[in-house]
Regions:
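Generic structural signal for well-ordered alpha-helical scaffold segments
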Residues: 28-31, 100, 123, 203
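N-terminal glycine-rich anion-binding loops that anchor highly charged ligand groups
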Residues: 1-3, 22-53, 66-68
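Generic N-terminal amphipathic, Lys/Arg-enriched alpha-helix
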Residues: 1-18
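Active-site-proximal beta-alpha core segment in soluble small-molecule metabolic enzymes
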Residues: 44-180
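Short, surface-exposed alpha-helical recognition segments that flank or form part
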Residues: 18-21, 110, 189, 193
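Active-site loop/helix belt of alpha/beta enzymes
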Residues: 134, 141-247
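A conserved hydrophobic position in a structured secondary element of the catalytic/binding core
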Residues: 18, 114, 237
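A non-catalytic, amphipathic alpha-helix used as a structural packing/dimerization or gating element
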Residues: 21-29, 193, 197-200
Length: 247
């Protein structure tokens, strides 16, 4: 439905106007691309932060959703979402308590770690509650914000895998449009490098005796391309839902 000039003039500002039909087409296009590549899709909800859109994504075939913080995960759980990855290292006792309170309400909760200290705090909390928490180790593939450097990933993975109360099932990264350490507009090159770096991390961790399953990567600019490399098992794009010219 298109708004007339008269209807637009009557809107209170600031306001957000969403083309739901276009959003649904974007959801379906990204899902189709992931399916064609044989890669799971776990969209990030930080763009919309609305359970109604997250449910659309899951109904279209998404494996689950990704959140940036505990409060987003709480909102999504209240809205009926049951498979949630909080893709930011869980630091601070109050955040951990809230995350652990979510676990019984969900079919699957995945938490993030990127250091021994972060994992130790999670391990202690899980043991105190009698829980076994699924975790993923974040790999720094060039963004330089969070994550363990590639060369230290295997050693840290071994230590985390030995911690009681934790089950290390995978690795993840957020790289965005970075190639050889610098910003780029070439999403194909960025995606190829991202896939290769994550495949290398996975190989080194498995060679160290840690049997991870999930290798998760991809942003909206690189999501389709990194899925098509065949080097990752899951992609987590987010902004694609409202970017009507991206796909």
């Amino acid at each position: 439905m298109k708004l007339t000039k008269e209807q637009l003039a009557m809107l209170e500002t600031p306001c957000v106007i969403l083309d739901v039909a276009q959003a649904r087409r974007n959801i379906e296009a990204m899902q189709a691309a992931a399916d064609a590549a044989g890669c799971a899709l776990r969209p990030h909800i930080k763009t919309h932060k609305m359970a109604v859109f997250a449910r659309m994504q899951v109904e279209a075939g998404a494996q689950g959703i990704t959140c940036a913080k505990v409060s987003e995960a709480e909102t999504m759980a209240a809205g009926g979402l049951r498979d949630i990855f909080i893709a930011y290292p869980m630091v601070g006792a109050f955040r951990i308590r809230r995350a652990l309170a979510l676990a019984p309400k969900l079919d699957r909760l995945i938490l993030a770690v990127d250091s021994w200290e972060c994992a130790r705090e999670l391990s202690d909390a899980a043991q105190a509650e009698g829980l076994c928490l699924e975790v993923r180790l974040e790999i720094d593939t060039g963004a330089g914000r969070t994550g363990v450097p590639l060369e230290h990933a295997a050693a840290l993975a071994q230590r985390i895998a030995a911690m009681p109360g934790l089950r290390l099932t995978g690795i993840y990264t957020f790289k965005g449009l970075i190639y050889q350490g610098a910003p780029t507009q070439d999403n194909i090159l960025a995606a190829k490098e991202e896939g290769e770096m994550m495949a290398e991390a996975a190989r080194s961790i498995r060679a160290a005796g840690v049997a991870i399953q999930d290798v998760s990567a991809g942003s909206s600019p690189t999501g389709v391309a990194v899925a098509q490399t065949g080097l990752v098992t899951e992609v987590r794009p987010g902004t694609y839902i409202f970017k009507d010219q991206m796909l």
